[in-house]
Curated annotation (Swiss-Prot):
This is 3-hydroxy-3-methylglutaryl-coenzyme A reductase 1. Glycans are attached at N275, N521. Keywords: Endoplasmic reticulum, Glycoprotein, Isoprene biosynthesis, Membrane, NADP, Oxidoreductase, Transmembrane, Transmembrane helix. The gene is HMG1. It comes from Oryza sativa subsp. japonica. Residues 78-111 are annotated as: Disordered. Residues 118-532 are annotated as: Catalytic.
Amino acid sequence: MDVRRGGGGGRIVGAARRALTWGALPLPMRITNGLAMVSLVLSSCDLLRLCSDRERPLGGREFATVVYLVSLFAHPDAPATTTGDDDDGQGGSRRARPAAAEPAPMHGHGGGMMEADDEEIVAAVASGALPSHRLESRLGDCRRAARLRREALRRVTGRGVEGLPFDGMDYQAILGQCCEMPVGYVQLPVGVAGPLLLDGREYHVPMATTEGCLVASVNRGCRAISASGGAFSVLLRDAMSRAPAVKLPSAMRAAELKAFAEAPANFELLAAVFNRSSRFGRLQDIRCALAGRNLYMRFSCITGDAMGMNMVSKGVENVLGYLQNVFPDMDVISVSGNYCSDKKPTAVNWIEGRGKSVVCEAIIKGDVVQKVLKTTVEKLVELNIIKNLAGSAVAGALGGFNAHASNIVTALFIATGQDPAQNVESSQCITMLEEVNDGDDLHISVTMPSIEVGTIGGGTCLASQAACLNLLGVKGSNHGSPGANAKRLATIVAGSVLAGELSLLAALASGHLVKSHMMYNRSSKDVAKAAS
């Protein structure tokens, strides 16, 4: 019995020693690791059985087993274990790869990676041995990381990206703020409309767009507004919202939490808990809605010059932590329950507002309507009723009672570093036109309840977008009056929409829309290229 066991132990040790020659194995590393693990388990069991026999001392076979177990973890050629760089928020560990596919300098920490040459790193990324998203943390050089990722992408896909610009971007600035795993940036033309005379000040409005005729149209609207004495704006409300979803054991219990959260007597306490998250975030109100035993609590707060989504989310987490002490049976489902509502056209935003709620108006003189807009006051009023009001109602629009507010909002958002996806709710707008001064002049207004903008954070840090904000005089934070820059930017958005609405409606009323687009938004060049 002892002889057979001894022979098995010898074979195990021999196999283990052969398995230690990592680089000499023709098998993939995952198979080699599996064999090594089996050998480790068998050797450990064998050693434990022998050690449990106290009537006989350890022999050569047992000593060899101990040596093997030690050498397995101390072998100089063994692949290094994953370093702390795995804790990068991506969720997931590195897959084992053949040693030849991963250059030796990459087995260590960032210092070794920095010394590796570009070819080694690109090969590792292309093969999957080095995850692309770790390049910045391993190299410590964001520009180099983007350049090598770009080359690895070319090798993996077999397609070049020469037309995608690389130089001219500050890749360090976007790290952890704007974009992950960058390989370049997209160029968009930026036009300037204006001057827009708004609240007694002139603005030259930057617009990033690929739609020909858009900037020209807004520019014409600005000219009509300025020639008539300018436009005026009113900020109705300033409050970013976040609505977590929580679940309670019963609808009755959810109603109790609703009553507690909305009670005026508890507001100061909840506001104090909420406001701990920021110097600028200040809770304004809490409104709740029930769906069975699920409760949606809509927290609204001012956020200074930031758009404020992160700010309000942190404050909400503070309040949820407090409420769980008061209502220990409350189960937090999500910090966002879609009652906020972010990046979706919703009735709650249309009615309650989100971000900045702005009204902008102007009285356009009759002669300006005729000379600049090439139409009449009567035609414009009739068109607005039939198209923007009745037509949108027939379509079942939700906040879409306008001609093309989204066009202007998106162009301004991209130019000034806002979140383009928030164009969804920010473009909710109702355009109103009326005859005034005995029908001689035109009163036009736009009401926009959910303009979500900021002058700090997000894409506002990028050089191009910061330049556009600077052009408008709203770059960065207003230290003298926190929040003033973001509020002014919201009014500029509304004023620009006013100009765009006025000009497009005039083009439709006069029948000039198609002619204008044929002049400024032609696709004939692309068609000719495709044909050739």
